């Protein structure tokens, strides 16, 4: 238990210095301890990201969250209050849409991680289902993570924060970023009036709609939560066949074009 407390304190100390320029939950509230059982924290000595447990051996995250010496934390809620349900794993294998990891901000920002050994489900560790259909515009979805809760001057919580946002028409994101392609395998999601958003530290975490992981936190503007500047999420439904093929053992499966 002493070692766990030391680790927890180290995570808290370094988290504020360890974020890539990516995503967080601004404008949210502390997650209920029972609502984020699939939420995973990916971490090394340089930065942290989110992820989602999809079965006993596999975690889904963003390609730009790839890191050396990745450690995978499951069942965590409050970093300052360790509990016996917490698990730690390392990455055994990682899979990307392109072997070169030549993803872009608007396409193929997805990573599938096989852990070094399976986890046992518990009251604080459970998987999230892959999508059976894509979300519709207007759907209310849930975001969560240990990312910054203020922006641009970031502060980071020791517990994950959650918030609701809406699936928006992709044209809203193109209006905010005219350089985006006309079509993309991303979801545009947020609150048009601003105030709620993912932000630094939330990258790789889930966008949950109707109890399924529909999106992966990919990128957004800085400062976060600006009006008319929603976030961008990898559209998981478009990659479901690829994910299932990799898990089934077809490691040469290709992503959709």
From Swiss-Prot:
Inhibited by diisopropylfluorophosphate (DFP) and PMSF. Keywords: Disulfide bond, Fibrinogenolytic toxin, Glycoprotein, Hemostasis impairing toxin, Hydrolase, Protease, Secreted, Serine protease, Sialic acid, Signal, Toxin, Zymogen. Its EC number is 3.4.21.-. Residues 1-18 form the signal peptide. The active site is at residues 64, 109, 203. Disulfide bonds join 31-162, 49-65, 97-255, 141-209, 173-188, 199-224. Expressed by the venom gland. Residues 25-248 form the Peptidase S1 domain. Glycosylated. Contains 23.0% of hexoses, 8.3% of hexosamines and 1.0% of sialic acids. GO terms for cellular component: extracellular region; secretory granule. Residues 19-24 form a propeptide. Coiled coil: none annotated. Transmembrane segments: none annotated. Monomer. This is Beta-fibrinogenase. It comes from Macrovipera lebetinus (Levantine viper). The lineage of its organism: Eukaryota, Metazoa, Chordata, Craniata, Vertebrata.
């Amino acid at each position: 238990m002493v070692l766990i407390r030391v680790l927890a304190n180290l995570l808290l100390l370094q988290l504020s210095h360890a974020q890539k320029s990516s995503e967080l939950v601004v404008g949210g509230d502390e997650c209920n301890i029972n609502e984020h059982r699939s939420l995973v924290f990916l971490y090394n000595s340089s930065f942290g990201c989110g992820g989602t447990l999809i079965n006993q051996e596999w975690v889904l995250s963003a390609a730009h969250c790839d890191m050396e010496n990745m450690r995978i934390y499951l069942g965590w809620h409050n970093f300052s209050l360790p509990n016996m349900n917490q698990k730690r794993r390392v990455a055994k294998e990682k899979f990307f849409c392109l072997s070169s990891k030549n993803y872009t901000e608007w396409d193929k920002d997805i990573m599938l991680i096989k852990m070094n050994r399976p986890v046992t489900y518990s009251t604080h560790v459970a998987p999230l289902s892959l999508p059976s259909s894509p979300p519709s515009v207007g759907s209310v979805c849930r975001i969560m993570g240990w990312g910054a809760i203020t922006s641009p001057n970031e502060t980071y919580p020791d517990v994950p924060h959650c918030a609701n946002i809406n699936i928006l028409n992709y044209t809203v994101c193109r209006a905010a970023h005219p350089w985006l392609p006309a079509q993309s395998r991303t979801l545009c999601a947020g609150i048009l009036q601003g105030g709620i958003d993912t932000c630094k530290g939330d990258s790789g975490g889930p966008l949950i709609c109707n109890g399924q992981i529909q999106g992966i936190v990919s990128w957004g503007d800085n400062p976060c939560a600006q009006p008319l500047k929603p976030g961008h999420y990898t559209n998981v439904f478009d990659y479901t066949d690829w994910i299932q093929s990799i898990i089934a053992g077809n490691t040469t499966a290709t992503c959709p074009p």
